[in-house]
Amino acid sequence: MDRLEGPPRLILVADLDCTLVDHDDPENNDLLRFNALWEAHYRHDSLLVYCTGRSFSSYSSLRKKRPLLTPDIAVTSVGSEIVYGGGESTVSDVVWTARLDYKWNRDIVVEETLKFPKLEPQPDKSQEEHKVSFFVGREDAVEIMKVLPGILEERGVDVKLVYSNGYAFDVLPRGAGKQGALTYLLDKLDIEGKQPSNTLVCGDSGNDAELFNISDVYGVMVSNSHEELLQWYEENAKDNPKIFHASERCGAGMIEAIQRFNLGPNVSPRDVMDTENFHGESLNPAHEVVQFYLFYERWRCGEVEKSDKYLQNLKSLSSPLGIFVHPSGVEKPIHEWIDEMENLYGDGKEKKFRIWLDNVTSSHISSDTWLAKFVKHELSEGKVRSCSTKVLLSYKEEKQRLTWMHIHQSWLDESSSDDQEKWIF
């Protein structure tokens, strides 16, 4: 949360499975739409929070399978763990962890729940120090929830029980849960003088319901929400104008909520097909780089006309003296790399070629110059290659827009230089 000097314009809190991540959408179309919107318009002054029932290790595994952005905060294990960063570099909130120790004894919870044969323990990867998880049917869950808290209270353990998706049963410390974790984070921001202008919570299942109970937040239940959440809405929130049931699934429903509540820009750059003017907004470096790489993706996929006018437009965006340093170390003028794009037109059409940018930041380093930094991910034939990217941009009065002066990339992780002739920009 220290990334922002002032109060966040928006805190967007999203459940993952079946909310931000649509498991019925193998192409990740709406997730990529959300990614482009967030990086172009929100990353610079807002906070992205993932709030999931998954353990942190399970969440990390999902990041390797889906094009998830790096959040500012990851709330995992149904609110029993808070991690700042949520990517490769993370810091756990030890104060929150210590709070959850109050009237909590995991050994006693395990001992007492073993006496309920209907409770089937979930795999070890789903178990955490402050979360004991089971599978159980709805009717059995209702009966167990009536008696288990009292049994544990007699042994000095104060718990919260969360049932979701028609099968997941979690035993947590009383102060845990998604509501408790988010309330804690909002209180921290308030103490620091960084109370957000708006907060939007997004969910689809029973363990998300308590998020909508937090005062002064906006809430969206995506169209594919589970019956247990819809029932909660009918009984508790149908008259609350700040909470609504979207008509769109998953990420599309989240974008719909941003529009409905007038929380800020709500048109994803992926929904803009103006290839005649594909450069970004005049003084928004984040929007500039997102739009640039979206056009590059569309060129590689053959989704725009193969016309020299587009390549000339690209050249007009960059300085004739501009240099691109390829992640392999090869340096050539940007215009020469643009010329090489002609040979790659449409080569990604059958390869499910996609590009997304993550963690886009920009610094105003002089009166007319910006330095944009981000991670570029490129997916082709199921393989993701990633590089850190720096772009130097200068505002040219005569063009009334930003000009690309220099691009420098470096490979990340296990990304390699195989087929490096097909890696441009």
Curated annotation (Swiss-Prot):
It comes from the Eukaryota. It catalyses: sucrose 6(F)-phosphate + H2O = sucrose + phosphate. Keywords: Hydrolase, Magnesium. It is an enzyme of class 3 (hydrolase). Coiled coil: none annotated. Pathway: Glycan biosynthesis; sucrose biosynthesis; sucrose from D-fructose 6-phosphate and UDP-alpha-D-glucose: step 2/2. Its cofactor is Mg(2+). Its EC number is 3.1.3.24. Pfam families: S6PP (PF05116), S6PP_C (PF08472). GO terms for molecular function: magnesium ion binding; sucrose-phosphate phosphatase activity. GO terms for biological process: sucrose biosynthetic process. Gene3D superfamilies: 3.10.450.50, 3.90.1070.10, HAD superfamily/HAD-like. Catalyzes the final step of sucrose synthesis. PANTHER family: SUCROSE-PHOSPHATASE 2-RELATED, SUCROSE-PHOSPHATASE 3A-RELATED. Belongs to the sucrose phosphatase family. Homodimer. This is Probable sucrose-phosphatase 3a. The lineage of its organism: Eukaryota, Viridiplantae, Streptophyta, Embryophyta, Tracheophyta.
